[in-house]
């Protein structure tokens, strides 16, 4: 059977002791299939021994690769997704991490599953991203994308912060808390889940606002349409840290405004044949597990 994809880039988890074996096994297997194989330059530098393969930057991968295989955990996938979003390169994840909500191909059968995907046997879904910016005195001082979430929190402070929340230009409330998680459906099974936020199906066009330890019994998570524009303004004298997918960080000052909404960019995520969202949740979250009695 002829390959559905002709070129593939491999992106591995940096500074991981066991990623090299998986990267080389996949690279050699795909090259034997006749595919052009690139290894992302940071990955190549981290694992060493990649002289037999072409090393490529994210920009080169975005312009030349037809598929990117991300080998690591969800954090590796989040980074790759942000870096490649504007290029619309489809991504598939091989899980070397823990839960792996985004990297759903098991290492044990990665070669077989990737063989199926290369042959065109896969399902594809689009995951929307958040476009976030920080304004200071009306001027943009930071901007980035987030696939999972944007988190405004108290940072190193040993006390709560205070901020105003506005949606589509309308004031909603002033809140005192440890912060706020603004989550996409993709991020609803990450930090937001730990803060008692709702699980949002990837097909839901919604953005979840999940307070962190609010100083009010009535403060509850709220799900908004993904057409909303959200603003959080820090009130004096409180500074805060703003985290994007738990990777990029910006230290905000009192008076700064975080503005965000759905980005026009989206991530193309490929799943192996037979993938089922509910089965994935059942496995990762141990739904229907039988209690053990010692």
Swiss-Prot record:
Give binding positions for NAD(+).
74-75, 148-149, 159, 176, 178, 189-194, 247
- For this UniProt record, give its keywords in alphabetical order, as a comma-separated list: ATP-binding, Cytoplasm, Kinase, NAD, NADP, Nucleotide-binding, Transferase
Q: Which residues form the active site?
A: 74 (proton acceptor)
What is this enzyme's catalytic activity, as reactions? NAD(+) + ATP = ADP + NADP(+) + H(+)
The record's Pfam families line, in alphabetical order, gives: NAD_kinase, NAD_kinase_C
The EC number of this protein is: 2.7.1.23
Instruction: Name the cofactor(s) required for activity, per the record.
Output: a divalent metal cation
Task: Identify the domain of life.
Answer: Bacteria
Q: Does the keyword Phosphoprotein apply?
A: no
Which subcellular locations apply to this protein? Cytoplasm
Naming one, the record's GO cellular component terms include:
cytoplasm
Chief location category: cytoplasm
One GO BP on record is: NADP biosynthetic process
Q: What class of enzyme is it?
A: transferase
> From the UniProt record, which GO molecular function terms apply?
ATP binding; metal ion binding; NAD binding; NAD+ kinase activity
**Cited HAMAP family:** NAD_kinase (MF_00361)
Q: What does this protein do?
A: Involved in the regulation of the intracellular balance of NAD and NADP, and is a key enzyme in the biosynthesis of NADP. Catalyzes specifically the phosphorylation on 2'-hydroxyl of the adenosine moiety of NAD to yield NADP.
Protein name as catalogued? NAD kinase
What does UniProt list as this organism's lineage? Answer: Bacteria, Pseudomonadati, Pseudomonadota, Betaproteobacteria, Rhodocyclales
Q: Which gene encodes it?
A: nadK
């Amino acid at each position: 059977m002829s390959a559905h994809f002709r070129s593939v880039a491999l992106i591995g988890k940096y500074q991981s002791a066991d990623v090299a074996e998986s990267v080389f096994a996949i690279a050699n297997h795909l090259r034997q299939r006749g595919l052009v194989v690139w290894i992302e330059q940071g990955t190549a530098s981290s694992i060493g021994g990649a002289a037999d393969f072409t090393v490529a930057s994210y920009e080169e991968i975005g312009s030349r690769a037809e598929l990117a295989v991300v080998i690591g955990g969800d954090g590796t996938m989040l980074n790759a997704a942000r870096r490649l979003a504007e290029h619309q390169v489809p991504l598939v994840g091989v899980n070397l991490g823990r839960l792996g909500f985004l990297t759903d191909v098991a290492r044990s059968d990665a070669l077989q599953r990737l063989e199926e995907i290369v042959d065109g046997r896969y399902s594809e879904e689009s995951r929307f991203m958040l476009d976030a910016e920080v304004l200071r005195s009306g001027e943009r001082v930071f901007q980035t994308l987030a696939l999972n979430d944007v988190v405004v929190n108290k940072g190193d402070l040993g006390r709560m912060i205070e901020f105003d929340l506005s949606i589509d230009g309308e004031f909603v409330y002033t809140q005192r808390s440890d912060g706020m998680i603004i989550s996409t459906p993709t991020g609803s099974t990450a930090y937001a889940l730990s803060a008692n936020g709702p699980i949002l199906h990837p097909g839901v066009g919604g953005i979840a606002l999940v307070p962190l330890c609010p100083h009010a019994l009535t403060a509850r998570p709220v799900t908004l349409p993904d057409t909303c524009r959200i603003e959080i303004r820090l009130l004096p004298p409180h500074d805060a840290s703003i985290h994007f997918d738990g990777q990029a960080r910006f230290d905000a000052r009192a008076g700064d405004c975080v503005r965000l909404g759905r980005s026009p960019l989206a991530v193309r995520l490929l799943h192996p044949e037979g993938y089922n969202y509910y089965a994935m949740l059942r496995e990762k979250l141990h739904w229907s597990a039988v209690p053990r009695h010692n």
